[in-house]
Amino acid sequence: MLQTNDKLKKIKGDASFRSFYRKSSSKKKSIVVFASKEKEKNLLIYDAINSLLIKNKVLAPKLYSENYKKNYIEIEDFGDDSVFSLLKKNKNQKETLYKKSIDLLGVIQKIKQNRSKNFKGKTYKIPIYDNVKLFNEANLFCEWYAKKFVKKNKLTKFKIDIKKQIRFLLTLLQSKEKVLVHRDFHASNLMKYKNKIGVIDSQDALIGNRAYDLASLIDDVRFKTDKIFKNKIYRYYLKLNKKRVNKATLLSDFEILSILRNMKIIGIFTRLAMRDKKKQYLKLIPYAWKLIELRISNNKKFSELKSLLELNFSKKIRNQK
């Protein structure tokens, strides 16, 4: 619990409505998370998911104290060594860190429970990551990015056509198996702590397609990797899960979800800039386009989407930051 003499130092946050402070006066290292908006998700659900992860031998932040009325929780501090920051310092450890992250993903995807209690003792049932939600997320591309670049006289038709393509891709998803999906399983949310890889920022977790988190990691918009490396990490995941997955199904779902995720990301980053004045994410949009182009070129089933995007978004537009 926070005391009046506690010293708090604000630390860099993320794209959410939360703010983070490092508590320096405690014997234990801790982070205080404040969330006056979306309190239930950012405090109660975050704790419920972390509890589930910890129960299943996944390194996630422990809860130290909470004051829901005052909009905060105090959690374990994993330090500053995210996989992203470690990769920036030394790219030679790239393969090791990515493989350890895939190992962690394997543990998460073996979790069978879909319920967990939060610090108020209430059971939280993790929702399904269904096609409605996937559609609404990909549609952020249309609602925020497209309206910025597609000419007004063409926008209505473009919206109809792109929504049709998103729905078409969703009908092609094949995997019936459902696993715990973190939804932001990328280098910035994976932390090296106590010589292990742990995970943070898990409040948005849902039950869904195993290829989603794999696409989040391999096609991470924040850290560029070449096609050879991406294929190597993909094959490593396949080797670890060969008894659990159908090769063709996994690859098809992976490509589809990577495309839809990066469309979502372009939409979200545009919204952050336009609505919330957080323009620092715009610089990542050109690489999100590169990732879409990489996956879209792999299969004829994406040909209509490819043509539609090429017709409306020139290279000049795609490279704008």
Model-derived features: where do they sit?
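ATP/Mg2+ or Mg2+-diphosphate-binding catalytic cores
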Residues: 267-321
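ATP-binding pocket architecture of kinase catalytic cores
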Residues: 21-136, 150, 174
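Acidic, serine/threonine- and proline-rich low-complexity regulatory regions
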Residues: 244-255
